[in-house]
Amino acid sequence: MDKSDRDSLDFEIRPDEPVFTSGVVCRLLGMPVWVLKTLDREKIISPTRPQGRDRLYSRMELKKLHQIWYLMEKRKVTVNGIKVILFK
């Protein structure tokens, strides 16, 4: 495979396609794993769980998590506060 073949790898991933693992999400957002697991346990987010595999998140979920993490980290909103904001 030459360089032009490698550079031509171009494809679309739908915004709702679950492709990001928990580890990748945490690394991209700078979010501790325990926060992500808490949000899942509290039903604030609902990742896809393929049989016996890690949780997977879509770009849409990543955007939602980014907003949630901003509120938690910068505005000091608690998990219960996030629930009130999202589910009122």
Where in this protein do the model-derived segments appear?
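Arg/Lys-rich, alpha-helical DNA-contact motif
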Residues: 1-29, 37, 41-47, 51, ...
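Key DNA-contact positions within bacterial/archaeal DNA-binding proteins
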Residues: 34
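Conserved catalytic core of two-component sensor histidine kinases, primarily the HATPase_c ATP-binding
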Residues: 54
